[in-house]
Amino acid sequence: MKMVAPWTRFYSHSCCLCCHVRTGTILLGIWYLIINAVVLLILLSALADPDQYHFSGSELGGEFEFMDDANMCIAIAISLLMILICAMATYGAYKQHAAWIIPFFCYQIFDFALNTLVAITVLVYPNSIQEYIRQLPPSFPYRDDIMSVNPTCLVLVILLFIGIILTFKGYLISCVWSCYRYINGRNSSDVLVYVTSNDTTVLLPPYDDATAVTGTAKEPPPPYVSA
């Protein structure tokens, strides 16, 4: 049997700030819940009062609306779906239901894949950054300063920033996956112990019955006769 040190077992299920992966997943789910709830409140207030968040074409540097009603409804539906997924992950980690964490884990994989595609696009088409910056409205903060930066340096800075984000997101994915494996393994070990205890109870007879049967089956030894 392989012996595992207590500190090794602890750090194998620990994440940032030395907390358990289950605790980290709960905190991550709550954090995503707060963010999506704030976004939902902003979208609902914008839907209730469109003039407050309305931007004209001159302000945006183009002939298009900032967000119409159809896009607003789609964004609200996505926010509601994200709140449901985050709530499922938080509840699943708290109540130790591994299946409830899967939707949140799939969302993390999808988000990581999108950011990876953005990094690949920046790397393959570096001129697309300059084109995107030119399409920004003139009132955008630091637009002229960003345009004056060397394109190669700008690409390197953006790639470094995206790389840091991808590293952090990958770490969060590993934490959630470790929490899923921990809950799955714990539930499996509980079932295994339960089945083993029942088998032991059924297979082993009571001690009194075993000694009684053994005592009746044994015959006394023959008497000793001296030569």
UniProtKB/Swiss-Prot annotation:
Complex and partners: Homooligomer; upon reaching the lysosomes. Interacts with MCOLN1. Interacts with NEDD4; may play a role in the lysosomal sorting of LAPTM4B; enhances HGS association with NEDD4; mediates inhibition of EGFR degradation. Interacts with PIP5K1C; promotes SNX5 association with LAPTM4B; kinase activity of PIP5K1C is required; interaction is regulated by phosphatidylinositol 4,5-bisphosphate generated by PIP5K1C. Interacts with HGS; promotes HGS ubiquitination. Interacts with SNX5.
Phylogenetic placement of the source organism: Eukaryota, Metazoa, Chordata, Craniata, Vertebrata
Disulfide bonds: none
Organism of provenance: Rattus norvegicus
Transmembrane segments: 26-46, 72-92, 100-120, 153-173
Region: Required for NEDD4 interaction, residue numbers: 205-222
Compartments, record wording: Endomembrane system; Late endosome membrane; Cell membrane; Cell projection
Protein name (database record): Lysosomal-associated transmembrane protein 4B
Post-translational modification comment from the UniProt entry: Undergoes proteolytic cleavage following delivery to the lysosomes.
Known function: Required for optimal lysosomal function. Blocks EGF-stimulated EGFR intraluminal sorting and degradation. Conversely by binding with the phosphatidylinositol 4,5-bisphosphate, regulates its PIP5K1C interaction, inhibits HGS ubiquitination and relieves LAPTM4B inhibition of EGFR degradation. Recruits SLC3A2 and SLC7A5 (the Leu transporter) to the lysosome, promoting entry of leucine and other essential amino acid (EAA) into the lysosome, stimulating activation of proton-transporting vacuolar (V)-ATPase protein pump (V-ATPase) and hence mTORC1 activation.
